Amino acid sequence: MFAAPATMLVLAALAALSSAIPAAQTASKCSTGPVQCCDSVEHHTQPHVNNLLLGLEHFGLVKGLVGGLTGNVGIKCNPILLSSNDCTAQSVCCEHVHFKGNIAVGCTPANIDIL
């Protein structure tokens, strides 16, 4: 009964947060996995980001994200492969990636060289 509204809420929130942030292009590895190229990276305390995460928890789509969360949240992220350096947004290292990269938490700027 609530699945459709939950999906609509998540999609609307992701659409609202989608904005490209120019950054250096790179292809490397983080200690937590591959470097992610995210359309948007914002601090978890931003009201719209916090509301998105609370909504995901409320509908049972993720658990325990908000309580212990620190740092930044990446929106619409894709891993950057070693054979590619096609990131025209922000390159970050993230601790956990959810929903095939649509939400990534614990993100920090990738401290890497341009290849």
Swiss-Prot record:
Where, subcellularly, is it found? Secreted; Secreted, Cell wall
Query: What CDD domains does the record point to?
Result: hydrophobin_I
Question: Between which residues do disulfide bridges form?
Answer: C30-C93, C37-C87, C38-C77, C94-C107
Q: Where are the transmembrane segments?
A: none
Which keywords accompany this UniProt record?
Answer: Cell wall, Disulfide bond, Secreted, Signal
Which residues constitute the signal peptide according to the record? Answer: 1-20
Which InterPro entries does UniProt cross-reference here?
Hydrophobin
What is the protein's major site of localization? secreted
Does Iron-sulfur show up as a keyword for this record? Answer: no
* A GO term, aspect molecular function: structural constituent of cell wall
Task of the protein: Aerial growth, conidiation, and dispersal of filamentous fungi in the environment rely upon a capability of their secreting small amphipathic proteins called hydrophobins (HPBs) with low sequence identity. Class I can self-assemble into an outermost layer of rodlet bundles on aerial cell surfaces, conferring cellular hydrophobicity that supports fungal growth, development and dispersal; whereas Class II form highly ordered films at water-air interfaces through intermolecular interactions but contribute nothing to the rodlet structure.
Q: Which family does it belong to?
A: Belongs to the fungal hydrophobin family.
The name under which this protein is listed is: Class I hydrophobin 21
Q: Which organism is it from?
A: Pleurotus ostreatus (strain PC15) (Oyster mushroom)
Q: Top-down, what is the taxonomic lineage of the species of origin? A: Eukaryota, Fungi, Dikarya, Basidiomycota, Agaricomycotina
Q: Which gene encodes it?
A: Hydph21
